[in-house]
Amino acid sequence: SICRLLLALGIGDVILVDRNGILAPGEEWMNPAQKEMAEITNKERLHGDLKTAMKGRDIFVGVSAPNIVTAEMVSTMADDAIVFAMANPTPEIMPDEAKKGGAKVVATGRSDFPNQINNVLVFPGVFRGAFDVRASDINEEMKIAASKAIAALISDEELSADNIIPKAFDKRVGPAVAKAVAEASKRAGVARIWVK
């Protein structure tokens, strides 16, 4: 789901990794869903482990297991790398270690660090917007609209390496996401009623 959204947003290449290694065509251990994703990702057809996958990359998005990334691995990424280490309660790498490795922006799923990425920012507004127009589906266009609505709540003046996303209980988020999702559902043709 994260990968499909990143691709829909126009991210040039995504490399997926699970405990067995990088998803790449021809890997015998992959299940059918992984085989499908391997066909649309990993343009360089890399094989190997997480360490290999991170070399030279701009962004790491982790939603897997605690303490699987090291500062050394982050140091092999592109300059000013972005690290979203969202395993809970212990992220793939702690923020101070990621920054020690050279990460410019670090986010986790935890409220005790800057840039908490929490699904509470998304779900209430997505469902409110979809319910308001009786959407028949929640599609990629609606998800993209939600992500852009959340991002727009941080002004250029507020934006910094430690402030890339609104706080979990920011009262502006739900209504902004709901409005964006409702509008996107209309554009996508899945709204069954029109609400002003």
Where are these regions (language model features)?
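Glycine-rich phosphate/diphosphate-binding loop of Rossmann-like nucleotide-binding domains
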Residues: 1-65, 193
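A broad, structural surface signal
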Residues: 4, 8, 52-55, 71, ...
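Rossmann-like adenosine-cofactor binding region
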Residues: 35-104, 110-112
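Adenosine-phosphate binding glycine-rich loop
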Residues: 85-195
